[in-house]
């Protein structure tokens, strides 16, 4: 039976460490690992329809994250009066110096699309 097919409960400490290292450096979590190591920005789409652009300082396998220098962006549609005119949505943002983001609110994490390619 290979290490991949074994349940975690049956793995040795070395096998667990190797599997975790592979998950964080090769799999989808590698984007977060690279962001922490190289201090790159990432863009995070959240379930509340807001976007976060910031630097990841720490994270875990559940995508809980500690972020710094975060720009939170969202759009709001202002309430209109009695007129039948449709209101235009307004882009809003705010700066957050440090924050903890719970992983269950994360939909998507991508490298900063506006950063120059390296």
From Swiss-Prot:
SUPFAM superfamilies: Sm-like ribonucleoproteins. It is found in: Nucleus; Cytoplasm, Cytosol. Disulfide bonds: none annotated. CDD domains: Sm_D2 (cd01720). Keywords: Cytoplasm, mRNA processing, mRNA splicing, Nucleus, Ribonucleoprotein, Spliceosome. GO terms for biological process: spliceosomal snRNP assembly. GO terms for molecular function: RNA binding. Plays a role in pre-mRNA splicing as a core component of the spliceosomal U1, U2, U4 and U5 small nuclear ribonucleoproteins (snRNPs), the building blocks of the spliceosome. This is Probable small nuclear ribonucleoprotein Sm D2. It comes from Caenorhabditis elegans.
């Amino acid at each position: 039976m290979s290490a991949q097919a074994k349940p975690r409960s049956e793995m040795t400490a070395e096998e667990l460490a190797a599997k975790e290292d592979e998950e964080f450096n090769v799999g989808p979590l590698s984007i977060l690992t690279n962001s922490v190591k190289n201090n790159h920005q990432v863009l995070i789409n959240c379930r509340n329809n807001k976007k976060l652009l910031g630097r990841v300082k720490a994270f875990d396998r559940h995508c809980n994250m500690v972020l710094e220098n975060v720009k939170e962006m969202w759009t709001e549609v202002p309430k209109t009066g009695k007129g039948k005119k449709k209101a235009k949505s307004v882009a809003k943002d705010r700066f957050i110096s440090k924050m903890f983001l719970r992983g269950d609110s994360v939909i998507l994490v991508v490298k900063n699309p506006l950063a120059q390619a390296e």
